[in-house]
Amino acid sequence: MFNKLVALATVMPVFLYAGDAAIGGNPSALWYIVSGTCVPEQGTQAAQRTCVQVDISQGLDRGFAVLKDNAKAKPFEYLLIPTRRIAGIEDPRLADPSTPNYFEDAWEARRFIGTSLGANPQWDMVALAINSMQDRSQDQFHIHIDCVRADVRTKLKENDQTFGAQWTQLDLPPPNHPYAVFRLVEDSLANTNPFQLVSQRLPGAAGHMGLMTIAVVGATFPNGQNGFYLLASKASSSMDAHGEDLIDPDCHVVGR
């Protein structure tokens, strides 16, 4: 099976990956790239040729890879992808305390945005997002790592005093999509797993995680302390749940 994955990966042009657009319509494309190319490259001269980072120091079941999205429309975006098979946000293992906190790893990987930009974006200029089951076309879990939209950043800042350790409803562009917002006053995600927080503490999420989208946006509070805004929204028959919409692939927020 492993050799089969390697063979499949060699015929898949990595550079065609564009967000949730599947390569050649293949919803397993990301999985084949990571398992068939990025992981085997480790320990060889080709290391980091395909993925900019692969961490399997704790084994494949707890590892992850970071892949540059090379779509022309996403010049600064990266994707964090587990090195084990996880389809997406609906997988109950993501809320299990024994599962790695992939959002923590994705936040640490924000440094790669700076590599592409030529300058590190400020803490509160970065956003992470995972789309709902119905609003993705790749069936391998991945977190988008990019800049937050400037208008989203502004609205979160303007409403900061209304947020707390309970979920608060807020409409965010584009265009006035309803999100539940949780204010996290910690400068690390080490002690907070967004999947657990949403599935266990957001009303209506438990048992329906496949309909959810989750985003994490860096926050710098009025007192200067860094933290996070955790955002979640639920898909319905009339509304998608595509947290990636909160991202600005052109990174205008950094003054480009």
Regions found by a protein language model. Name each.
Residues 1-4:
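Positively charged n-region of N-terminal signal peptides that target proteins for export
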Residues 6-17:
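Bacterial N-terminal signal peptides
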Residues 19-256:
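HIT superfamily nucleotide-processing domains
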